């Protein structure tokens, strides 16, 4: 099956985002899929890009919002407003209220009250949902096991999403004891002042030497519960071409994706294409999970066995992390970052004007030290 995956440039400086367009061969020519939309401007650029290459009446078979963070969702609204989308896949937090209720600290909350709070707090998601309904698009929630074109959703499972929801940044306080008992306590993300402090540390960042044999990336990184709710997609395009799209998934989501793939009989370590999660953050991956997904570290000079793309602005000081790129290189990846330019991976289709084969980023012998 012919297919192509386009990573469009999104965001500036410390505000990266995602916007991906997938085209794949079908019985009636081809189908289009859009995954996330980045910010408002990038969402408009996705609309223009599709109109330019496929016409003003182009049909998008499926549009998927991986999670509710603004750097993925703001542009998604523009995509639904500007394109003929048939099926929309997005999580609606308020519908998870009944299942999430036991994991909130306030035991006086009712499912109805909680749903109202969630719908009010996640007004952008509600607005996107409203656009989809107004334009007569079918709306589905993407949970593990569902099929979307040539892709299968590996994560999140509906029950896991209900446990993660109380730990989102805009939800009422979580019941930590209940979540620890459920085995999935992550915690709320850091506040605004903590993020400012992190940026100050970044400017004074230390660099350390890294070799092929001495991997400095560590297990145990922690990302937000919202990121852990990201939709992870396993694509099988026949002829041995397998694709893994990860959104902003972290260790939990990736580990659960591995378990789901194993139960479903989907091979790991045999991908042609992998998305590096969360713009190349070291909080989302570690050696153990990468070994499970990609395979072990290869001897230096072994060559490349798959492509690994990452969305990252060209002027972002923290994304992608060099040690993360090195980790993918060690395991056989040809690593490509957008960094202000659209990048395309294709099988069977000719390159669109402006695209050409790209070379892998090199291995870095100096990487960011941990704090």
Regions found by a protein language model. Name each.
Residues 28-31, 40-89, 264-283:
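Active-site metal-binding motif and surrounding structural segment of the metallo-beta-lactamase
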Residues 18, 284-295, 302-371:
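C-terminal regions of proteins
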Residues 40-41, 68-74, 95-98, 146, ...:
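Active-site environment of divalent metal-dependent phosphoester hydrolases
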Residues 244-302, 307-310:
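Extended hydrophobic/aromatic segments used for targeting, binding, or gating
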Residues 1-4, 10, 81-242, 329, ...:
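Flexible, acidic/histidine-containing loops and adjacent segments that form or flank the divalent-metal
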Residues 32-35, 61-65, 87-91, 242-246, ...:
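Structural recognition of the beta-strand scaffold that forms the well-ordered cores
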Residues 1-57, 226-252:
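Conserved beta-strand hairpin/beta-sheet module of binuclear metal-dependent hydrolase folds
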Residues 51-55, 77-87, 259-267, 291-302, ...:
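Short, surface-exposed basic-aromatic patches at helix termini and helix-loop junctions that form
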């Amino acid at each position: 099956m012919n297919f192509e995956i386009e990573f469009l440039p999104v965001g500036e400086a410390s505000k990266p985002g995602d916007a991906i367009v997938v085209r794949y061969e079908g019985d009636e020519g081809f189908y289009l899929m859009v995954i996330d939309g980045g910010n408002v401007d990038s969402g408009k650029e996705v609309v223009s890009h599709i109109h330019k290459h496929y016409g003003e009446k182009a049909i998008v078979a499926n549009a998927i919002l991986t999670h509710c963070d603004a750097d993925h969702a703001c542009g998604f609204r523009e995509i639904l407003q500007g394109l003929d989308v048939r099926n929309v896949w997005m999580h609606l937090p308020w519908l998870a209220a009944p299942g999430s209720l036991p994991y909130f600290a306030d035991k006086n909350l009712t499912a109805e009250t909680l749903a109202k709070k969630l719908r009010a707090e996640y007004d952008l998601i509600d607005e996107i949902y409203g656009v989809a309904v107004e334009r007569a698009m079918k709306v589905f929630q993407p949970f593990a096991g569902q099929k979307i074109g040539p892709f299968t959703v590996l994560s999140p499972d509906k029950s896991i999403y209900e446990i993660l929801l109380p730990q989102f940044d805009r939800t009422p306080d979580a019941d930590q004891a209940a979540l620890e008992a459920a085995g999935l306590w992550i915690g709320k993300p850091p506040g605004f002042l903590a993020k400012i402090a992190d940026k100050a540390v970044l400017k004074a960042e230390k660099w350390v030497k890294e070799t092929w044999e001495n991997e400095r990336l560590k297990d145990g990184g922690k990302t937000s519960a919202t990121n852990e709710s990201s939709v992870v997609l396993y694509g099988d395009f026949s002829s041995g071409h397998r694709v893994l799209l990860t959104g902003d998934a972290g260790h939990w989501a990736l580990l659960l994706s591995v378990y789901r793939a194993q139960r479903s009989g989907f091979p790991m370590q045999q991908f042609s294409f992998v998305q590096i999660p969360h713009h190349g953050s070291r909080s989302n991956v570690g050696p153990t999970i990468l070994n499970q997904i990609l395979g072990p570290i290869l001897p230096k000079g072994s060559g490349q066995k798959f492509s690994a793309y990452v969305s990252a602005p060209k002027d972002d000081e923290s994304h992608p992390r060099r040690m993360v790129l090195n980790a993918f290189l060690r395991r056989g990846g040809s690593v490509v970052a957008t960094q202000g330019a659209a990048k395309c991976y294709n099988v069977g289709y000719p390159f669109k004007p402006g695209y050409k084969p790209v070379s892998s980023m090199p291995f870095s012998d100096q990487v960011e030290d941990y704090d």
